[in-house]
From Swiss-Prot:
Any Pfam family matching the protein: Glyoxalase
Any Gene Ontology CC annotation: cytoplasm
Residues annotated as catalytic: 123
Cofactor needs: Mg(2+)
Domain VOC intervals: 12-127
Function: Metallothiol transferase which confers resistance to fosfomycin by catalyzing the addition of a thiol cofactor to fosfomycin. L-cysteine is probably the physiological thiol donor.
Binding residue positions for Mg(2+): 15, 74, 123
One GO term of the biological process aspect: response to antibiotic
Key word Transferase present: yes
Transmembrane segments: none
EC number(s) on file: 2.5.1.-
PANTHER family assigned to the protein according to its UniProt record, in alphabetical order: FOSFOMYCIN RESISTANCE PROTEIN FOSX (PTHR36113:SF6), LYASE, PUTATIVE-RELATED-RELATED (PTHR36113)
Protein name in UniProt: Metallothiol transferase FosB
């Protein structure tokens, strides 16, 4: 439904779906790394509850996975700064593929970048959008702000 000014009324993210090459391996990853609760599993599909977010996996074993690694495209989740070190340690203990983060200013807060077994990139980040905007407004005069 369109709202009064003709814009689509987006109410939020409905679900996240990831194409996976090995459903069992991916289920184990999402359960262990994200503590996602498995809701249903079929031959080619699994659905999870991730703190109220619907997460879906679809088995697509024949899809080439090499291109996904070249992009900065990722999904970022907010974590509490006090949990950063413990989460980083936990990911290491689970043998998760932790990526080198991009160079950043300390005002940009802390991040852990990592991939699932198929190369989908994720980030656990301690900052907020407001943190980022405040930093950019102060230190990046070349940027144009619309808010």
């Amino acid at each position: 439904m369109l709202n009064e000014v003709g814009k689509i009324n987006i109410k939020g993210i409905n679900h996240l779906l990831f194409s996976v090459s090995n459903l069992e391996k991916s289920i184990e990853f999402y359960e262990k790394v994200f503590h996602a609760q498995l809701l249903v599993k079929g031959q080619k599909t699994a659905y999870f509850d991730l703190n109220g977010l619907w997460l879906a996996l679809n088995l697509e074993a024949d899809i080439p996975r090499n291109e996904i690694h070249k992009s900065y495209t990722h999904m970022a989740f907010t974590i509490d700064p006090k949990d950063f070190d413990a989460i980083h340690h936990r990911l290491k203990n689970l043998n998760v593929n932790i990526l080198n983060g991009r160079p950043r200013d300390k005002q940009d807060q802390k991040s852990i970048y990592f991939t699932d077994p198929d190369g989908h990139k994720f980030e656990f980040h301690t900052g907020t959008l407001q943190d980022r905007l405040s930093y950019y407004k102060k230190d990046k005069p070349h940027m144009k702000f619309y808010i």
